[in-house]
């Protein structure tokens, strides 16, 4: 098989997050996948992106569909790339989790940590305990997903969009 052919794989892949990196990744996946569903939280943003087919300096590939229904995304995509800021990651996982099954594969591209404050003491004068979690740990805590990975740079979405050489690492405990 010639791996350079467009739309080589007849699968639908999901990307959560319409920021620069989420859009760049959706376009990159669109080169090899039949269809990419790009999830936007805002219906207004989704309408605008579907109409203009442009997000900042990114032109959006024809086979990328911008959606606002997270249950539809989980139903249609076994492979999902959550690409949202770390401050919103746990909330996003809580919204997505009811629709996920153990067979889903999540490869997050979120930099940073989840800082979870909990005040376990009944004494309000005592400081809160801060727990620090990776995004992979948040996925495990908030969902039934078993296969989890992480995609990381060094890469810049503008370089990816411009088809410049870029490097990424995908790490996981699983071989897929």
Residue ranges and their predicted role:
Residues 43, 143, 172-175:
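Short loop segments at secondary-structure junctions
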Residues 67, 72, 79-165:
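Rossmann-like NAD(P)(H) cofactor-binding subdomain of soluble oxidoreductases
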Residues 15, 38, 106-108, 150, ...:
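Structural beta-sheet core signal
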């Amino acid at each position: 098989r010639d791996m350079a052919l467009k739309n080589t794989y007849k699968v639908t892949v999901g990307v959560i997050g319409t920021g620069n990196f989420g859009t760049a990744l959706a376009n990159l996946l669109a080169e090899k996948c039949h269809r990419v569903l790009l999830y936007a939280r805002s219906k207004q943003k989704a309408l605008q992106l579907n109409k203009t087919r442009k997000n900042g300096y990114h032109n959006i590939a024809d086979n990328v569909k911008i959606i606002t229904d997270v249950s539809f995304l989980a139903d249609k995509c076994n492979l999902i790339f959550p690409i949202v800021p770390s401050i919103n990651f746990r909330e996003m996982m809580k919204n997505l989790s009811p629709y996920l099954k153990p067979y889903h594969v999540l490869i997050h591209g979120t930099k940073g940590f989840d800082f979870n404050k909990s005040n376990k003491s009944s004494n309000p004068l005592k400081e809160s305990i801060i727990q620090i979690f990776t995004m992979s740990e948040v996925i495990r805590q908030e969902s039934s997903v078993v296969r989890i990975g992480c995609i990381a740079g060094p890469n810049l979405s503008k370089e990816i969009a411009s088809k410049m050489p870029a490097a990424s690492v995908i790490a996981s405990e699983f071989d897929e």
